[in-house]
Amino acid sequence: MKRIVTGILAHVDAGKTTLSEALLYTTGNVRKLGRVDHGDAFLDTNTMERQRGITIFTEPAIIATPNLTLTLLDTPGHVDFSAEMERTLAVLDYAILVISGADGIQGHTETLWRLLKRYNVPTFIFINKMDAPAADKTKLLNQLKKRFSDGCIDFTGAHDDNAVLADVMEDIAMQSETAMELYLESGTIQDETIREMIADRVLFPCFFGSALKMDGIDEFVAGFERYVREPEYDSEFGARIYKVSHDAQGNRLTWLKVTGGEFKAKTMLSGTARVGTDLGESKIDDDGMWHEKADQVRVYSGAKFTTVDSVVAGTVCAVTGLTRTFPGAGLGKEPDGVNPVLQPVLTYTLLPGECDIHACLVALRELEDEDPLLHVVWQPHLEEVHLQLMGAVQLEVIQQMMHDRFGLDVSFGPGGILYKETIAHPVEGVGHFEPLRHYAETHVLLEPLPAGVGMRFASVCSEDVLDRNWQRLILQHCREREHLGVLTGSPITDMKITLLVGRAHLKHTEGGDFRQATYRAIRQGLMEAKERGDCRLLEPWYGFRLEVPQDMVGHAMADIQRMSGSFDTPSGDGEYMVLEGEAPVAQMRDYAMDVNAYTHGRGHLSCVFAGYRPCHNADEVIEQSAYDPESDLENTPDSVFCAHGAGYPVKWYKVPEFMHLDYAWHGMGEQ
């Protein structure tokens, strides 16, 4: 029996959850056909999902047929919850991409297609709502071939064991040299060759129907069952985590797919600490790894679960007892995943109202544990909590979750652009912390990294100079928080922080001393870089695809240039023109409404996060932020030295005159 993990993805309102219900009902896995608009869909297990009629959280369902055990992961379709969807892609064997026959390919559908390509997920396509008056099968197929791939081929009839897809066999053969050779030799293509082409993402079977009316569902199930193949797994244990949640009793659930070997309850697990998490000194070993024992292993289908003793490779399960896991992490042989493509570019300020702000912070930390992209930050000097969100609908959901789960009635201020900071050249930072009966000095090298790499950490300090335990502690302090830049107080990124040298006192040094010295060293280095003009402000950019009527392309081009964006040579078919390029989020965030207005609803704009670039109006943003790094006492660049039995502060620019260790990087000595 084949064991397959499949995700179902779609633009919002394409009928994704309705198709999931139809698949469950057709295969006899549910007795009653639920409906999203009736609030009784099998996979919409959350109250908010039933109220809003949209999928917010990825939920599993087990579909069993005589030849297939299918774990179906129903993912969110709304763009604000795309991060939840993207995290799921790393555990999929196949994807089912649902497209509305009435609307065709939408902007978010194109984003999904690009993500499926990036994660190399073989894809079946179900064109839904074919009962709608506007649905045109020929037109939709042409659109799929033009916008996605020539490998998008109608598989109507593929469920029949005797069918050979005769009408499209030549089209299938044209997608692969091997398939063409076989077709020319025998006049047909065997099922195994078709399975291989689908797995290699050169062939994308397309099915048409109406999930609500149960039309085309049997055909799709049979075709899917016929043309998928089970992945091969080895005996070495591995697992990939795609989600963290909490059940109604408050138990923390780590959702994962086993990718090798067997996973048993009560197994001792280990993994790499997540950057930005303070693990506590007793929770991490010298290599920066956590070690915890799994408790229960649960296999879910909808809201119900079965507790099992073990699961085999290819199984999706939820595990209790783990507190240090995070979405995207690998266990066993699996490495941690890559940085997600879809990331929030807006930051919001919590307005606690009459609620205790620290209680709000604790609640938001739990939500951040489930969704690390929230990036909850406490700003002590402002006594504010900031978090990052994808958009207004996610903000409303967070607000409702704060009320429903924690009893906190809060609101949020208007969203602002999430800026980041980096440096242009290497610099050595020095931090010294020596109040009476305390002692620590840290030297770190800050180096720029290529755009999009994020933060990296290392040590080149000799253990003859500083004990390994202290070095481990310093690196932990580098990782455990999101360090802020000195231009606008925005998070730093694309930077490598290397421990060069440090000093401890045999009698007076305590664990917290190196935390202070390390934080101050990083900030002092950033201030040195700012003094030299080496700090850079970064802003998020969108990659966009803009389709407008031909007579309006001039308007669109002028808009993009005005927004400091760029685009490739326009392309089109005569009636419509397409512009593809990049532009700052700050300029393009509300442009979809403008497009809808000047094209009278005929234009389409799709945007996807394209990374951070140098800010196009950095001086203006820095001035508006009015950030003073020397007044930010929670992130001070200054040091504390001791003389005559008392500690005294030393400004960052005077630290080199007082530091106890010489510069360790030759570049500083040459200044």
Predicted feature residues:
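C-terminal effector modules of nucleic-acid-centric enzymes and ribosome-associated factors
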Residues: 300-425, 468-531, 550-553, 586-588, ...
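Conserved nucleotide-binding/hydrolysis micro-motifs of P-loop NTPases
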Residues: 14, 26, 30, 78-79, ...
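Flexible hinge/switch segments at interdomain interfaces of large molecular machines
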Residues: 197-200, 285, 334-346, 377-378, ...
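Conserved nucleotide-binding/hydrolysis modules and their immediate coupling elements
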Residues: 227-229, 234-347, 384
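P-loop NTPase catalytic nucleotide-binding module
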Residues: 1-14, 32-33, 101-248, 269, ...
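P-loop NTPase switch module centered on the Walker A-proximal segment
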Residues: 1-91, 95-99, 105, 146-148, ...
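C-terminal accessory nucleic-acid interaction domains of nucleic acid-metabolism proteins
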Residues: 570-571, 578-671
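C-terminal polymerase-core module
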Residues: 415-480, 503-505, 536, 543-574, ...
